[in-house]
Amino acid sequence: MRALLALEDGFVLEGRSFTGPGETGGEAIFNTGMTGYQEVLTDPSYAGQMVCMTYPLVGNYGVTREDMESGKVHVEAFIVKECCKVPSNWRSEISLPDYLKRHGVMGIEGIDTRALTRHLRIHGAMRGVISTQETDPARLVERARALPSMEGQNLVTRVAPAAPYRWDGERPQAVTLEPGGCAWVGKGPRLVVYDFGIKWNILRLLAQQGFDMLVVPPSFKAADVAAVGAQAVFLSNGPGDPATLKDEIAEIAKLAQTYPTAGICLGHQLLGHALGGRTMKLKFGHHGCNHPVKDLTTGRIEISSQNHGFCVDIDSLTDVEITHVNLNDGTLEGFAHKTKPVIAVQHHPEASPGPNDSRYFFARFRNMVREAAGC
């Protein structure tokens, strides 16, 4: 089925829908990973975005429940050069086209993904529309221009939970907080995890470190954290512009004064704001599992998994030590407060997909909690 992709600057490409008729729009970006498409699709940080995969063949190993990073597909559309319709892998439970159809997400192939990637790299990520219904490119360009910019969008409200829950090792489990606080179930440090659109592998790795976790929505106040008797705080990844989360930033500023605190991706950006810094929009973002990062505390070079369109301005922070930098463009990838037990990284140490070079971050956080809180 013929499909058109139109960007706000007038750039138009023709392809074919492999998920049936429809029309959708969002910010067009590219991901440089060779594999890991299912983790990309189910990563809540991709909400509001149409993802173009630079690798030419996608879908050849199908989809399995084991590789999900959330309970649904979050991308607005999936753009590939060629989609494999008949996967070959013993773990596969469903084909990529059928999986996208099940979740009501458009997928298109036959697109010149090299041309699209080059255009976005030169001109920057931008709004776009995909349609099988509208045949006039000029009308689609106008529809793309009418979409909201990623800057100024609070997309956390689309993906964050409405109520606290626990992680049972495989799926979230609802929990009701008692008026007197929280009935912790484990023996490890009591950790409140803020879910701004969390990837499940973060919860898996925190559990491996022995934390007794309560996962909470962004609306959970610092006073609520104290009421449940938490000993540490973790801030997750998530989508959209971090500067829009002003209420959450104010609460995080209070938490960072009291608890050992760590953040990943959006959590890193929110901590940056809470410590007096600012964020800025990257031209085309960092999306993929092959981004080099240097840990300045050890001198070690890591290949990291990344997915962010915003970053903390490295010159805007005071009272922190810069711990990680991106070797492609020199942007900030991690910091630690000079006097408080606060650490954060912009990249994704939990990977999924990607290498495990940065997984030590979770052990580093566990050791920090042990030293700061004595637990």
Swiss-Prot record:
Belongs to the CarA family. Residues 1-186 are annotated as: CPSase. Keywords: Amino-acid biosynthesis, Arginine biosynthesis, ATP-binding, Glutamine amidotransferase, Ligase, Nucleotide-binding, Pyrimidine biosynthesis. Composed of two chains; the small (or glutamine) chain promotes the hydrolysis of glutamine to ammonia, which is used by the large (or ammonia) chain to synthesize carbamoyl phosphate. Tetramer of heterodimers (alpha,beta)4. Its EC number is 6.3.5.5. Pathway: Amino-acid biosynthesis; L-arginine biosynthesis; carbamoyl phosphate from bicarbonate: step 1/1; Pyrimidine metabolism; UMP biosynthesis via de novo pathway; (S)-dihydroorotate from bicarbonate: step 1/3. Residues 190-375 form the Glutamine amidotransferase type-1 domain. It comes from the Bacteria. It holds the Pfam family GATase. It catalyses: hydrogencarbonate + L-glutamine + 2 ATP + H2O = carbamoyl phosphate + L-glutamate + 2 ADP + phosphate + 2 H(+). This is Carbamoyl phosphate synthase small chain. It is an enzyme of class 6 (ligase). PROSITE patterns: GATASE_TYPE_1. GO terms for biological process: 'de novo' pyrimidine nucleobase biosynthetic process; 'de novo' UMP biosynthetic process; glutamine metabolic process; L-arginine biosynthetic process. L-glutamine binds at S45, G238, G240, L266, Q269, N307, G309, F310.
